[in-house]
């Protein structure tokens, strides 16, 4: 009898040993928070567009610039007067600039991830030249707003995560040069991806129509060439 009990316990223990590793693998896998690599670039596109529209273009900068320009000149200083009544230090508070600075660089991290997945042909992202071009247009907009507002900014060494926590400042004229080069890449990829529909409904700006992104890229290229002329007047002679 003891012999049978011993054999039964041995088999049971062996069975537990065999399944323990698999069970722990399942338990330790985080299904709620997949790694960035597991998320297709197309799904990140929506967030990149939203963040660019609401944080970069229509965020704090839009309020402060309108107050310092249109409202200050045309409305009897109303906005500035009310701002001073609310908080006399509002215009010098660190959050005035830190919030939008951090949100734009956070958005750029997302945009660079999208590009990396397509360029490195991560499964599920292969050949999506239309999305790659869209991401490059969005990158140009975000860096463009940053340098328009702050002048010299981290650019060539920026958005490297833990790889570089103290990126150098690049001169504004060099940032504009980089932006124009990025837009050239975007135009090439959008031309290549004209017939693709990789973005689908994730493109909440132009509904996945590459030709509209192309038009935006050309318009932005004209804008930033003019901005570059302001800091490097002889640029057209090169």
Model-derived segments and their meaning:
Residues 1-17:
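Sec-dependent bacterial lipoprotein signal peptides
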Residues 4, 19-73:
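Membrane-proximal, proline-rich intrinsically disordered regions
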Residues 9-10, 33, 228-230:
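Enrichment for repetitive, rod-forming helical segments
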Residues 12-13, 31, 57, 233:
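Alpha-helical transmembrane segments and their juxtamembrane interfaces
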Residues 13, 57, 72-76, 81:
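Intrinsically disordered, low-complexity segments enriched in small/polar residues
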Residues 37-42, 76-238:
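Structured, solvent-exposed acidic/aromatic patches
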């Amino acid at each position: 009898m003891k012999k049978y009990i011993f054999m039964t316990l041995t088999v049971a223990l062996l069975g537990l040993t065999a399944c323990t590793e698999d069970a722990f693998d399942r338990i330790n896998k985080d299904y709620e928070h997949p790694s960035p690599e597991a998320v297709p670039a197309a799904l990140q596109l929506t967030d990149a567009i939203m963040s660019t529209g609401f944080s970069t273009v229509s965020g704090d900068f839009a309020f402060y610039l309108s107050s310092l320009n249109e409202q200050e000149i045309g409305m009897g200083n109303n906005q500035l007067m009310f701002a001073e009544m609310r908080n006399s230090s509002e215009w010098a508070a660190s959050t005035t600039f830190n919030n939008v600075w951090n949100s734009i660089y956070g958005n750029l991290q997302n945009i660079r991830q999208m590009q990396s997945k397509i360029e490195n042909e991560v499964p599920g992202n292969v050949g999506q030249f239309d999305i790659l071009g869209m991401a490059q247009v969005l990158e140009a907009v975000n860096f463009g707003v940053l340098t328009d507002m702050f002048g010299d900014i981290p650019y060539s060494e920026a958005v490297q995560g833990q790889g570089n926590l103290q990126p150098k400042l690049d001169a504004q004229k060099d940032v504009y040069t980089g932006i124009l080069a990025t837009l050239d890449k975007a135009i090439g990829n959008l031309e290549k991806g004209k017939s693709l529909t990789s973005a689908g409904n994730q493109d909440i700006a132009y509904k996945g129509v590459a030709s509209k992104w192309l038009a935006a890229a050309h318009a932005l290229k004209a804008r930033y060439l003019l901005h570059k002329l302001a800091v490097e007047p002889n640029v057209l002679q090169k």
